[in-house]
């Protein structure tokens, strides 16, 4: 009775502030460790590279050739520094921050997965919502502070040395990083709340992070192979729409989806506007992650309020999460195995049979190993039946023309141009030869104006040439050919 009365006296804001300050003090050691590691491994390394680049470009300009303009050197130096910064963020800073995020979240919320600890924490004179949000805010403060300090330090030193990349660009990179870190934190805490054990939450995060991109990639590859003329390539935003951990790397990836698709399925089709290497962070992408972060935060609050103490040391406090993740990973493995063995055998029967068997086997394995409820296996087959129906609808839709996609000929007014994809010449069977043969280049001698910011005034310039048909008569001819093929 005493605990109940005392819990009503303090406001939610006051309780939040107490938990926030207590958690910051409690985690100061790991926070200092995170700051020290990121400073040493990211900032110091980047600044050393910047000093080395400055020395190469400005202290010994004669090594780059004669008649090199200072403006050209400054431009090249800025580009090198910017590329080094993005590389360091993708390979050092973001992975370290993610490791700190996961470790801190598990350390902070592990009391929810121990029956004695959860009873003790829930008996404290404090409401659940301030307890949850105070801990999350403390972790987010450390993450954001470390990211801001490192990036602003590197940016300030780079600009002092003459790097001309925009401060708006740097703030944009920082803003995207902070937003996705917030989404990753909310997603991690949601998994910890929804699962009854730490191991269950970790496995759920791994399955979701691997399963969704694999499902999207395999689905896009099947659509390309089934619908003539389709050049669908899953964009980085779609591949990482449900995985904020991977979405952190989208602006820093270079052609990742293209090479992944070619390596897995042998499909050389590549569209720069739809690849992971587009490096485009659109307003819609930002709005999407703002919405996802808000939904995950609300889900954390609602789930934690209704979470029973008896859920500790159980597999799941909310079984609905395992149904969704199992659906995704079973479908991804089924489609992936179907593509592999279908291409290997060249048989449609093998393709469909493998899709059914692989997805069913994955469903059984996740039920037995991850969920650990063998007695519930017969009942869980109802959810696998839903997956089988969804896959059947997908395959039937593709077999019947993709809802009219195959038979649709765009109107002449809707066509800006038609790209001609020439077959090229093959010298051997290597991927490099194929990619080289698909590249058309034109080399010309170019004399540029005196005020042009280039290394040499007289230069040989190479242009990438892509055959296009833009005249009305050419478009009409191709449309007639398309209609003839359909007929």
Where are these regions (language model features)?
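Function-determining sites in protein domains
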Residues: 380-387, 397-487
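Central hydrophobic cores of alpha-helical transmembrane segments
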Residues: 199-212, 356, 379-391
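Aromatic- and glycine-rich beta-strand/loop motifs that create alpha-glucan
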Residues: 1-35
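Helix-loop-helix units of permease transmembrane domains in multi-pass membrane transporters
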Residues: 108-141, 312-313, 481
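Internal/C-terminal transmembrane anchor helices
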Residues: 326-333, 364-406
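Terminal transmembrane helical anchor/hairpin motif
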Residues: 2-6, 12, 48-82, 214-303, ...
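Secretory targeting signals
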Residues: 83, 137-201, 205, 213, ...
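Long, hydrophobic alpha-helical segments
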Residues: 88-117
